[in-house]
């Protein structure tokens, strides 16, 4: 039976291997025709970036020094060779195959003609930025440690993604999924130093975010607040750029049941229940957004959601639970708290504040203010004084119903619409937020922020209080989150999750399509939307991050494979390039030998590991081949597309003698342990109804699930949570679902004939 809305948990993976290459001669995916027959430059310097060069990036507009180009993190390029008058001539230049089939979320860094990009597990690709020829590649799975283990993939909430590298002083810094931080020689890709950043490997920590550099430090956070029985306790670690020696560590939430070691943790502890359950670590991971102000020497941390989501379980007596869902400023020299602002006090909805932040100088109230801007998940746009943390303005940038406004102290006023303690509630925005990790962009010319907005509700369920058949889902704790589309049918899920809102209740709210993605041009001074363009609907969601340029252009990739180019001032669509690949990352722009290029990483996955590929997504139509795509004026008219996806028919499933009770128990166990990665349909992880690799044999199936037989491919062992009887019940459920799919396939074929 096809489910017409999705249960979102959060990945597994497919195997890939890359080899360090000493020579720059290797197969590049494809190349477009050149506008001129001029031999491209051969790079002569590698990673030659210091803080002064980064801070004065506008003197070198052809470089893209960091994830957001410069130290402001604005994802804005001063280049204008490609502009609103000639962008119709933008065409394909070259592509590089990453040999992956998962989400790719990084914006490449380009320095002196060399492109540095990261991929799944924390792999790094150094390429000639003109031709795409590989200079070297780095695979953390070949460096010892746990980088290739399935446990790291099992603990990753949202695929085995990586959001970027940092480049400084001839080194490329990257973190692997299992939490090791590497400093690589920018010329060769060989490790200069490495360090394990994880404090406790018995907890489900992973790392997917990019390192943040200060004057002399590399700062890295982690993830894991959604996983296991009690998640993890968030922190960031700062290491010496040259040696890798740890200089300080900042925790974001107090440790349960222990005396606190710092003034900021003592203050935070007062906002938590002193008798809280020590199994629950608290969460607050810094899994993505960070920023740095060199003049103030402050590191800004975007702190994430709670562990678990439900505050009644996490901190029964209530409280704001600092520093969850906060923007936190830390002194880069001492590692001590400078200030904090909490966006969602006592967060119950996975409304972390981990989204990327932008530093800007804005004319507000008759003077120029040094601000930090963020559009976090909760639906409010924040403009804060970045020296003091004082709010300057806070305004909703999308529809929300969890809050009915702000009080005089800029604290959100909670509405009863989002209290799911007494029954499931339809809540806006959904857990992916009004805006997730996909970068927004600030254009200093238009003074507009371009936000990839997600407009969707969620139905949030307290499983125990709703008398559900399951009381825990890995990746969601004691809650379940359903994201309804226009064909929402609650009867599909009632057997597992109990009573649910009826269809008419879901269709209230914004008055627009229930689930859609919108690109919005937001004026942070006037606090309003200037223009908006719907980019996707019918549940493709998760379109790409945004880049703006001095050519009056805004670039955004989409899940359906389109790379769209808009006029920055009006939002008029100027150019569409069909790539055949789902795009989640933000593009970059750079110039080499007088030619401007636009590059973007393409590969669908990430949080969509928790759902089948939407029917109108590129990943449902084409193979989800990971690529770096590069474009220039007078490039090729057609961008090569991946091969079409061809599904083999369901094979007759193996015979079994399972009882209805065993199958029903297997359905519950599958929902609790397997469903956040393995969906029935085309998805990132395999559809288990399509038996293969010997898993049609019960003994082999047990070895895969309990012993980690396929750990090298990303399928970790579950012996800590499942028994042999549990696995047999899961297999019975899968075989039963395979039998239904095989039967339905035959009936469709018979009807067609």
Question: Which residues does each PLM region occupy?
Answer:
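Blade/loop signatures of beta-propeller domains
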Residues: 37-92, 256-265, 412-414, 507-509, ...
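Gly/Gly-Pro-rich "capping" loops immediately C-terminal to redox-active cysteine motifs
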Residues: 667, 679-717
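Repeat-blade elements of multi-bladed beta-propeller folds
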Residues: 64-68, 103-123, 152-180, 206-228, ...
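C-terminal motif of bacterial Sec signal peptides marking the signal peptidase cleavage site
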Residues: 27-29
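Short, conserved, GDST-rich strand-edge loop motifs in beta-rich repeat architectures
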Residues: 220-234, 274, 301-321, 455-512, ...
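Flexible coil segments in periplasmic/lumen-exposed cytochrome c-class electron-transfer proteins
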Residues: 644-664, 671-673, 680, 713-753
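Extracytoplasmic beta-rich repeat domains
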Residues: 96-107, 137-166, 194-210, 226, ...
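Detector for the c-type heme attachment site
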Residues: 69, 386, 677-683, 706-707, ...
């Amino acid at each position: 039976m096809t489910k017409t809305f999705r249960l979102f948990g959060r990945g597994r993976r497919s195997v890939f291997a890359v080899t360090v290459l000493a020579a720059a001669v290797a197969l590049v995916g494809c190349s477009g025709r050149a506008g001129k027959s001029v031999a491209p430059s051969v790079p002569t310097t590698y990673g030659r970036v210091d803080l002064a060069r980064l801070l004065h990036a506008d003197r070198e507009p052809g470089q893209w020094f960091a994830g957001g180009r410069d130290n402001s993190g604005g994802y804005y390029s001063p280049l204008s060779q490609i502009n609103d008058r000639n962008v119709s001539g933008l065409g394909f230049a070259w592509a590089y195959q990453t040999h992956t089939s998962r989400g790719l979320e990084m914006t490449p860094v380009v320095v002196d003609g060399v492109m540095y990009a990261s991929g799944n597990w924390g792999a790094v690709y150094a390429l000639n930025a003109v031709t795409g020829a590989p200079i070297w590649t780095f695979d953390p799975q070949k460096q010892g440690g746990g980088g290739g283990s399935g446990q790291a993939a099992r603990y990753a909430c949202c695929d085995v993604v990586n959001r970027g590298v940092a480049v400084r002083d001839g080194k490329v810094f990257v973190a692997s999924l299992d939490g090791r931080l590497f400093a690589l020689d920018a010329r060769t890709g060989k490790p200069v130093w490495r360090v394990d950043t994880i404090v406790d490997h018995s907890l489900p920590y992973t790392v997917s975010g990019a390192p943040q550099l200060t004057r002399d430090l590399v700062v890295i956070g982690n993830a894991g607040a959604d996983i296991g029985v009690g998640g993890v306790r968030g922190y960031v670690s700062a290491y010496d750029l040259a040696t890798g020696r740890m200089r300080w560590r900042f925790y974001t939430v107090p440790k349960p049941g222990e005396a606190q070691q710092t003034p900021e943790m003592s203050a935070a502890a007062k906002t938590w229940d002193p008798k809280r359950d020590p199994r629950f670590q608290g969460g607050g991971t810094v899994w993505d957004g960070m920023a740095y102000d060199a003049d103030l020497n402050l590191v800004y941390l975007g702190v994430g959601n709670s562990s678990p989501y439900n505050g009644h379980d996490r901190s029964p007596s209530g409280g704001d639970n600092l520093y969850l869902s906060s923007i936190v400023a830390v002194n880069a020299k001492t590692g001590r708290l400078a200030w904090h602002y909490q966006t969602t006090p006592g967060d119950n909805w996975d409304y972390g504040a981990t989204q990327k932040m932008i530093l800007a100088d804005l004319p507000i109230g008759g003077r120029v203010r040094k601000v930090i801007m963020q559009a976090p998940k909760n639906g409010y746009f924040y403009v804060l004084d970045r020296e003091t943390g004082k709010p300057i303005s806070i305004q909703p940038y999308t529809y929300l119903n969890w809050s009915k406004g702000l009080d005089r102290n800029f604290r959100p006023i909670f509405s009863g619409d989002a209290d799911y303690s007494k029954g499931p509630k339809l809540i806006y925005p959904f857990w992916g937020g009004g805006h997730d990790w996909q970068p927004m962009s600030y254009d200093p010319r238009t003074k507009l922020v371009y936000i990839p907005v997600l407009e969707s509700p969620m139905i949030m369920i307290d499983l125990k209080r709703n008398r559900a058949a399951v009381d825990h889902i890995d990746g969601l704790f004691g809650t379940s989150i359903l994201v309804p589309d226009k064909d929402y049918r609650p009867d599909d899920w009632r057997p597992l999750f109990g009573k649910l809102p009826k269809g008419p209740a879901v269709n209230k709210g914004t008055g627009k399509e229930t689930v859609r993605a919108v690109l919005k041009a937001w004026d942070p001074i006037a606090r309003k939307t200037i223009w908006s363009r719907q980019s996707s609907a019918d549940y493709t969601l998760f379109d790409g991050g945004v880049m703006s340029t001095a050519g009056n252009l805004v670039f955004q990739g989409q899940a359906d494979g389109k790379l769209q180019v808009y006029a920055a001032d009006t939002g008029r669509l100027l150019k569409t390039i069909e790539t055949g690949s789902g795009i989640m990352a933000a593009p970059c722009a750079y110039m080499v030998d007088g030619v401007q290029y636009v590059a973007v990483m393409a590969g669908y996955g990430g949080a969509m590991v928790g759902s089948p590929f939407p029917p109108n997504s590129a990943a449902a139509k084409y193979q989800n081949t990971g690529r770096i795509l590069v474009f220039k004026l007078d490039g090729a008219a057609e961008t090569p597309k991946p091969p079409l996806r061809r599904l083999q028919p369901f094979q007759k499933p193996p015979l079994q003698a399972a009882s209805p009770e065993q199958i029903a128990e297997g359905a519950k166990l599958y929902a609790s342990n397997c469903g956040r990665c393995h969906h029935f349909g085309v998805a990132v992880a395999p559809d288990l109804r399509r038996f293969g690799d010997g898993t049609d044999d019960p003994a082999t199936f047990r070895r895969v699930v309990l012993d980690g037989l396929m750990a090298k491919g990303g399928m970790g062992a579950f012996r800590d949570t499942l028994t042999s009887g549990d696995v047999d019940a899961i297999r019975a459920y899968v075989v039963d679902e395979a039998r239904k799919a095989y039967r339905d396939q035959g009936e469709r074929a018979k009807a067609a004939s």
